Amino acid sequence: MAFKFNAEVRTAQGKGASRRLRHNGQIPAIVYGGSEEPVSIILNHDELNNAQAHESFYSEVITLVVEGKEVAVKVQAMQRHPFKPKLVHIDFKRA
């Protein structure tokens, strides 16, 4: 199964900004690795939550569309809420 998500570049940093994103149904994430600089991004929580239920989400290359540019990534780390079925943060590594 091929996964493709639209992402926005994240400019606001910090705990308060991250909490506001999560309250609005979005999730903060970061893309790093390769020769490019790390990029903080924002993704839709519901799309990711549904996709992460599939086993292949963790092993396949995922396509992120950031500012109209496609980036091939793999999930490096994922933080979940301790008791709610919510994602808190995701780290992606460029493939």
From Swiss-Prot:
CDD domains: Ribosomal_L25_TL5_CTC
Keyword tags: Ribonucleoprotein, Ribosomal protein, RNA-binding, rRNA-binding
SUPFAM superfamilies in the cross-refs: Ribosomal protein L25-like
UniProt entry tagged with the keyword rRNA-binding: yes
GO BP, sorted A to Z: translation
Xref: InterPro entries: Rbsml_bL25/Gln-tRNA_synth_N, Ribosomal_bL25/Gln-tRNA_synth, Ribosomal_bL25_short, Ribosomal_L25_dom, Ribosomal_uL5_bac-type
GO cellular component term, pick one: cytosolic large ribosomal subunit
GO molecular function (one): structural constituent of ribosome
Family label: Belongs to the bacterial ribosomal protein bL25 family.
UniProt-recorded name of the protein: Large ribosomal subunit protein bL25
